[in-house]
C-alpha cells in the first residue's frame, strides 16, 4: 500500500489522475496550499481516498502511518512552494523511522531492514564524527557493569574483516601489546581496542565501509559480530556506531551523542532529526567549547524533535589510565581546543604538563610536534588515530612511559548521567524479561 502526499496547488482532477497511475493508494496526506481547490471534503470525495490533515503536516503523516500499518511507501506528489528541501528531509526522516520508503519524482529514500538482537541491546550512535561517541559508549559500558555484564560490538572504517573479540575483562592491554597489533598491520586504535582498554569489558570489532545520508552503512560485517556476541555468556549488547553511521540493528533503546561544536544545521536539518528521533537519552558533549547560547539552541532542537528523550549537557574530563602524579608529561589529543582544559585537569592530578599537541589525527604535524617534546618522562595520549603507530612507538623507542587517556563525560547541567544510564539499562533489561515471560 501507498500513502500519497498532496497539496492545494494541484487541481483535484490532476491529483486523481496521478493516484490512478500510482495504484494501491490507501490514503493521502494534505501538506498545504489552497490556490486550486475548494474544501478538503470536496477533494476527498473527488479522490476517493481518506485525507489526513493537521496544522503540522508531520503529525498528519505520523497518524496516517500509524493507522495504516501495511503501508510500504510514501509517494510525494507535492512540489514547491508547498514543500522545500528542508520539508522533504523531515518527511524522509519520519518515513525512515517507520521503516517506509519515501519516493518523489527524482529521489528515493529507502530504509535498510533492521534486525533485532536476541539479547537486550542499547545503541550508542552519533550525529557526526568527533562528537565523543566512543567515550560515551565506554562510559555506558562501565556504568552498566554495576547491574549487568555488557559486551560492546563496534564497527569501524579500520575494523577487522572477521569479527575480533577482545576480552577486556581479563586481557592486559599494554602499550607494547597495542604496538605489536599495529606492527602486524591491524588498526590498534580501533574502537573495540579503546573500549576494552578504557572500560575493561569484552568487545567485538567489526568493519564497515561507506555511510549513507541517513546513517546506514554500505558494506559491513556486523551480522557476524552480533552472532558472536549472542553466543557469549554476556547479558546485554551495546551497539556502537561509527561516525554518523550506525549498526544495521534496531536496538531496544538508544543513546544519541551530539557534539556541541557541530553546525546546528546538521543537527536540526537533513537527517539529524532521524538520528535524534531514535533517542531515549541524548548526550550533548564538549559544551565547554561553545557559548551557552549554542547549547540552548541545541537543546531546543533536540526537545523539538524528540520531547520524550532525556537530555544531558556534558563536558569531557581526561581520565588517565595510569598514574600521572609527580610526572613531567606531554599531552597529545585530537582536539586543539580541548588541550588547555585537559592540561589543567591533569595538573590538578599532580602532573606537570610540559608540552602538548592537538594533532593526533594529523600525522605529519604530530611528528613535528613530538620532535619538540623534550624533558618528559611520560606522554598522555588518547587512544585515537595515530596514538599507537606514531605516539606509542615514538615513546617506547625513547624509554618514555605511555599513559592512555579516556575522556569521561561529566554533567554541567545539574543532572546525573550515570543514574540516567542505569535507569535506561534497567528499563531495557526489564522489558526483555517481560517479553520472555509472555
Swiss-Prot record:
Catalytic activity: (2R)-2,3-bisphosphoglycerate + ATP + H(+) = cyclic (2R)-2,3-bisphosphoglycerate + ADP + phosphate
One biological process term in Gene Ontology: gluconeogenesis
Annotated compartments: Cytoplasm
Entries under InterPro entries matching the protein: Cyc_diphosphoglycerate_synth
Keyword Ligase (UniProt): yes
Function: Catalyzes the formation of cyclic 2,3-diphosphoglycerate (cDPG) by formation of an intramolecular phosphoanhydride bond at the expense of ATP.
Protein name, entry field: Cyclic 2,3-diphosphoglycerate synthetase
Recorded name of the encoding gene: cpgS
Amino acid at each position: 500500500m501507498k500513502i500519497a502526499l498532496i497539496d492545494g496547488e494541484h487541481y483535484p482532477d490532476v491529483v486523481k489522475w496521478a493516484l490512478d497511475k500510482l495504484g494501491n493508494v490507501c490514503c493521502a496526506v494534505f501538506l498545504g496550499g489552497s490556490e486550486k481547490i475548494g474544501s478538503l471534503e470536496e477533494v476527498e470525495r473527488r479522490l476517493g481516498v481518506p485525507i489526513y490533515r493537521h496544522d503540522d503536516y508531520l503529525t498528519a503523516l505520523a497518524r496516517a502511518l500509524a493507522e495504516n500499518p501495511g503501508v510500504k511507501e510514501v509517494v510525494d506528489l507535492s512540489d514547491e512552494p508547498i514543500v522545500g528541501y528542508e520539508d522533504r528531509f523531515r518527511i524522509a526522516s519520519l518515513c525512515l523511522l517507520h521503516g517506509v520508503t519515501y519516493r518523489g519524482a527524482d529521489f528515493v529514500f529507502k530504509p535498510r531492514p533492521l534486525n533485532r538482537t536476541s539479547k537486550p541491546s542499547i545503541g550508542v550512535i552519533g550525529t557526526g564524527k568527533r562528537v565523543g561517541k566512543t567515550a560515551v559508549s565506554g562510559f555506558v559500558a562501565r556504568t552498566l557493569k554495576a547491574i549487568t555484564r555488557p559486551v560492546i560490538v563496534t564497527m569501524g572504517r579500520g575494523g577487522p574483516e572477521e569479527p575480533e573479540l577482545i576480552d577486556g575483562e581479563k586481557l592486559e592491554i599494554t602499550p607494547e601489546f597495542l604496538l605489536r597489533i599495529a606492527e602486524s598491520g591491524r588498526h590498534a586504535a580501533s574502537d573495540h581496542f579503546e573500549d576494552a582498554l578504557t572500560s575493561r569489558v569484552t568487545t567485538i570489532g567489526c568493519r564497515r565501509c561507506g555511510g549513507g545520508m541517513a546513517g546506514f552503512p554500505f558494506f559491513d560485517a556486523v551480522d557476524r559480530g552480533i552472532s558472536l556476541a549472542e553466543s557469549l555468556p554476556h547479558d546485554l549488547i551495546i551497539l556502537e556506531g561509527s561516525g554518523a553511521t550506525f549498526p544495521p540493528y534496531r536496538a531496544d533503546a538508544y543513546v544519541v551523542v551530539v557534539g556541541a561544536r557541530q553546525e546546528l544545521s546538521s543537527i536540526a536539518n537533513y537527517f539529524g532529526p532521524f538520528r535524534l528521533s531514535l533517542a531515549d537519552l541524548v548526550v550533548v558533549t564538549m559544551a565547554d567549547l561553545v557559548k551557552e547560547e549554542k547549547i540552548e539552541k541545541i537543546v531546543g532542537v533536540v526537545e523539538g524533535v524528540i520531547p520524550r528523550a532525556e537530555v544531558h549537557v556534558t563536558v569531557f574530563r581526561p581520565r588517565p589510565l595510569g598514574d600521572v602524579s609527580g610526572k613531567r608529561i606531554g599531552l597529545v589529543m585530537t582536539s586543539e581546543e580541548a588541550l588547555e582544559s585537559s592540561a589543567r585537569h591533569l595538573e590538578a592530578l599532580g602532573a606537570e604538563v610540559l608540552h602538548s599537541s592537538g594533532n593526533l589525527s594529523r600525522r605529519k604535524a604530530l611528528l613535528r610536534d613530538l620532535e619538540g617534546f623534550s624533558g618528559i618522562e611520560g606522554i598522555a595520549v588518547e587512544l585515537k588515530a595515530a596514538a599507537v603507530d606514531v605516539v606509542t612507538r615514538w615513546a617506547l623507542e625513547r624509554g618514555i612511559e605511555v599513559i592512555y587517556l579516556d575522556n569521561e563525560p561529566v554533567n554541567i547541567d545539574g543532572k546525573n548521567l550515570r543514574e540516567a544510564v542505569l535507569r535506561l539499562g534497567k528499563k531495557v533489561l526489564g522489558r526483555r524479561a517481560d517479553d520472555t515471560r509472555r
